[in-house]
Amino acid sequence: MRGAKSVIDLHAIAHNYNVAKQMMLQKNPSGHVLAIVKANAYGHGAVQVARFLLKHCSSIDGFGVSSIEEALELRHGGIYNKIVLLEGFFTEEDELKLIDDYNFSIIIHSEDQVNSFIKYPFNRPVEIWLKLDSGMNRLGFTPSQFMKFYNLLSNNKNVSNIGKITHFAFADMLENPEHTLKQWDIFEKSVAHLPGPLSAGGSAIILGWLNTVCTDWLRAGIMLYGISPFLSKNKDSKTPESVNIKPAMKLVSTIISVKHVDKGQPIGYGGRYVATRDMKLGVVAMGYGDGFPRQVKDGCPVLVNGVKAPIVGRVSMDMLTVDLSDIPDVKPGDEVIFWGTPELTVADIAKYCSDTSPYELVTKLTRRVPLQYTY
């Protein structure tokens, strides 16, 4: 069997949810935290993660997903708790029927959604979250539009409860607080006087802004998986260890060949890297076909038998090469770790790629990389 796999520590995810919940409750004793499991739980397996959280956490307030397909996967997997569709619905009749049948909560962010929603003959009222665009300029109603649609929905029989929700564009940049503070001010002034729950922000708010921004519901996304939302270049960055979250994914594979090359020999496609000395190379069963980034630079570290070794040469579809010259006794079958340890995190790997992030790296792993769970 090919050695590439993603080892998922479910206990770490449960620990991280509990960290988020405790931080929330310290600021708001009646507060709630939505566990975000969109994009297959950021590549960690949505159904397995949701089931484990429900079994091993004392109180799970609900789950957030992107689409109706993701929500149905949870329901069909036996998850009967609150599920919020973070992008609302995309088509009218088909999705609204499923929302009704499966009792999903939805975000509403456009006039078209409002018009479709109020016309549909629901069998029971639906919990909705009306989204305010407080300055991200993505989804949501502007402050000048918001009250029109709030009033329209608050008097509609299809609505059981209206929450108010927004999202922040710069919350992961602690050295640049002005934009987040401005968005928070707009959100408060626009909706805080209205009845019903408020939700503002995700992992960056939970870990970095609760002294300023605290609402009734927060959304724990990337932090659930042990990854800090804060950009490593920030002077005030918070590492996973400093905020007491544990990495949940360890990406591993194996050495499939060990060979020697002479100084001056090109390595890999295009000969991007040329051996600077007589070298011992390891060929590893991991490539961009598995989701490992093709754009990774030479020198990006991996762990071979617990020792750091640099990637040299271009990443191929199925393989990559590492310099084993300083590591003795490496043989085919030996383990290679790409990320998921205190010594080597997914954020470390992102630094060696152009214009990517830990979010992208963990969600881009392909089905060629099976998930192996530790319970």
Curated annotation (Swiss-Prot):
SMART domains: Ala_racemase_C. Belongs to the alanine racemase family. Pfam families: Ala_racemase_C (PF00842), Ala_racemase_N (PF01168). This is Alanine racemase, catabolic. The modification N6-(pyridoxal phosphate)lysine is found at residue 38. Its EC number is 5.1.1.1. InterPro entries: Ala_racemase, Ala_racemase/Decarboxylase_C, Ala_racemase_C, Ala_racemase_N, Ala_racemase_pyridoxalP-BS, PLP-binding_barrel. One of its GO terms (cellular component) is nucleus. SUPFAM superfamilies: Alanine racemase C-terminal domain-like (SSF50621), PLP-binding barrel (SSF51419).
